[in-house]
Amino acid sequence: MNHRRSKFARIDSMGVDGKLKSVRGRLKKVYGKMKTLENWRKTVLLACVVALAIDPLFLFIPLIDSQRFCFTFDKTLVAVVCVIRTFIDTFYVIHIIYYLITETIAPRSQASLRGEIVVHSKATLKTRLLFHFIVDIISVLPIPQVVVLTLIPLSASLVSERILKWIILSQYVPRIIRMYPLYKEVTRAFGTVAESKWAGAALNLFLYMLHSYVFGAFWYLSSIERKSKCWRAACARTSDCNLTVTDLLCKRAGSDNIRFLNTSCPLIDPAQITNSTDFDFGMYIDALKSGVLEVKPKDFPRKFVYCFWWGLRNISALGQNLETSNSAGEIFFAIIICVSGLLLFAVLIGNVQKYLQSSTTRVDEMEEKRRDTEKWMSYRVIPEYLKERIRRFEDYKWRETKGTEEEALLRSLPKDLRLETKRYLYLDMLKRVPWLNIMDDGWLLEAVCDRVKSVFYLANSFIVREGHPVEEMLIVTRGKLKSTTGSHEMGVRNNCCDLQDGDICGELLFNGSRLPTSTRTVMTLTEVEGFILLPDDIKFIASHLNVFQRQKLQRTFRLYSQQWRSWAAFFIQAAWRKHCKRKLSKTRDNENIPQGTQLNLASTLYVSRFVSKALQNRRKDTADCSSSPDMSPPVPHKPADLEFAKAEA
């Protein structure tokens, strides 16, 4: 019997409205390709991180035409960013719809390695927090796309630049908030987002650099706003200036822009300003002098890298090199950079240090244990082939348990908590074993759960050898084994069969009080996991079975026992040979000469000799298929039924 669960999550459609069936069907096709629910959560979390990196690209859309002294926009960047943003938002909308009609009822466990899902829209809608739903909706609203595609081409586009900045900021915060539940789900299922310590450190460093890039993008757009403010202030100081906000657009700009704006806003460092009429650009002077505001659309990588470097440099320096003007907004922006740099740097160092320590603690323990094992093997002069097998087993056990001693951990728990934990880990698997499925008493199964112990075997390992005593009964949960016999068991040499999930090795422990001798050799073909029951555990189970359960266990034992199957095959073959023998004897009787025939003595002797010779030839021709009594193999002895010892007082 196979104990492995279904590859995909189980979907229960009870209680779902008919209108949701089509949506659910499409979602099942999308999610059907995912290995587990946890992998899907990781994918959605990665999409959220990518969305955080895409949104600041909207701030790089405005440009300054240095030849005509007017504002323009990067149309190529508009198309690319809108397409990517729409694709990611659509992906997340599918995720929102899916979780609105699904509810996770069984988180990932170390025993099952699976998550189960039940489709139940009403239950989920009642339990889902309204706050998270509102945050999800605000996060995926296509407001930036609407602004850059509709408002910017209009005449009031300079006003829409400030609107765009606040829209990006208002959606950026909900996008960060919506990542927290996903992050908690992933860490609860996997223990960490990244399994490798270097991947975890790189992830924390990436998040630190992401904030640097975000601050650089806001600095870029604020520099353009500062330039626009300077031109408008210069026009306000001149009586003959009649430029309006719309005249600063390149599609409406004329020759007056070039003549007036060419000398209206000189780029002077804040420390060198001596005249009060000179405009103070503050910390945005670097963006204006570097020319990143005036580059052509095809030079976008240059603009992006420079703004990223500015943000990384000032966050790392906590904003100490920033020289601001007396503008309140600029000073507030500098304060945010300083405080954010301090917090981000502290979080980065703390997370990296914590992640490396948590990841290396068990690795160090494994290395220390490996060194002790090597010293012991060298001290005891263990042969090289045994050393290699020991090393491979230690590595395999580490991969499966991550250094956690499961049995020691379970023994340290209180009795009620230990029983509940073991019942959750083992009960479903034990119920699928035919030998244990006959137990109707729930407490007896729970007692068996408390007694089983998990074991691991490498490939090509011997579970038990022929002629050796059987000391434990193995219940296979994963892997394949081969059971062979070198003796003439049941009249056949090298009798072989395969064992897999749900099969049992060592069922002879049910017979008698002494340890039985194994009649077969069991060897693993692949890496095998399972549970073992010791002889005392078998006696405990047998002593608590009633008469009907014992009879049912005997029938189940006959059905699944290899000895009983082999004996049944030989018994059927012997019965068939006996049937063929009787049929042949009847044919011979029909060929005899009828009595009462009048023949003389010579003819009688001649006929008798002829019939005797013909019968001898007939026996010789049919010897291979008729199975004569002398050539027929003996029927093996019937295997013994299970013997149950009486319960000890």
Swiss-Prot record:
Membrane topology field: Multi-pass membrane protein
Pfam families: Ion_trans
Residue numbers binding a nucleoside 3',5'-cyclic phosphate: 436-559
Localisation per UniProt entry: Cell membrane
Keyword Metal-binding set for record: no
Cytoplasmic topology ranges: 1-43, 98-128, 184-200, 351-649
Extracellular side: 65-76, 150-162, 222-329
Function: Probable cyclic nucleotide-gated ion channel.
PANTHER family named among the record's database cross-references: CYCLIC NUCLEOTIDE-GATED ION CHANNEL 12-RELATED, CYCLIC NUCLEOTIDE-GATED ION CHANNEL 15-RELATED-RELATED
Name this protein carries in UniProt: Probable cyclic nucleotide-gated ion channel 12
Origin species: Arabidopsis thaliana
